[in-house]
Amino acid sequence: MLDEIAATTALHSENVGIRGILEEVAAVTGMGFVAVARVTDTRWIACQVLDQIEFGMSPGDELRVSTTICNDIRESGNAVVIDNVSSDPKWHSHPAPALYGFKSYISLPIILDDGSFYGTLCAIDPEPRKLVGPDTVPTLMRYAERVAAILSREAVSS
């Protein structure tokens, strides 16, 4: 039996609007794994996943939140965009890249209409990607805002 957080997260796992956003993020960034994750102070749960690199994660799967950069986003509320972990002075020593095998990374906070933090729109790839630029975060934040709007509408209708 699913607990309340897992059950609520599972409701979003087949939303076609969210799926379309994941596909757009993958196309725009070249990233092979894109997901919406429900992130709390104790949990990281995959809500919906587009996995083109055989990362091996499915909706409902969980990671230990303390091992994720998404946890840093939950704490700070700031987006993180990394072209190449090995040359990024802030993130090269973080345990997540080695643990999960990625070189490039994106994570954006998903803030619901009521102002609460839901989780993140995140993407990883085993190869470095050119992601950092003046338009990157604003463009990707619009995707996160679209996800937030969908999740907020679903919360109102359920």
Regions from the language model: what does each represent?
Residues 39, 43, 55-94, 103:
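Regulatory sensory and allosteric helical modules in signal-transduction proteins
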Residues 114-116:
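Glycine-biased flexible loop/turn sites that connect beta-strands or occur in inter-domain linkers
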Residues 27-28, 97-102:
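Short loop/turn motifs at secondary-structure junctions and domain boundaries
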Residues 1-64, 135, 142-144, 153-158:
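Intrinsically disordered, low-complexity terminal regulatory regions
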Residues 33, 70, 107, 120:
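Short hydrophobic/aromatic beta-strand element in the GNAT-like acyltransferase core
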Residues 104-112:
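A short, aliphatic-rich beta-strand micro-motif
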Residues 121-130:
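Short beta-strand-to-loop transition segments that serve as allosteric relay/switch motifs
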